[in-house]
């Protein structure tokens, strides 16, 4: 599964140990991580992570 929001791509995987879906925004120098209890929550948290990343770039 690949996530895309506003041109940013994100990974998606499942962490058996923590029983969570996890991912990070791809193609950027910073590590932007997100997680969710299910794929719907993962997608929502990915979009929020991208929005926060975009906002942080405006202030720097």
Where are these regions (language model features)?
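Short, charged, surface-exposed hinge/linker loops at domain edges
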Residues: 1-13, 18, 32-33, 40, ...
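Positively charged, aromatic-enriched nucleic acid-contacting surfaces
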Residues: 20-29
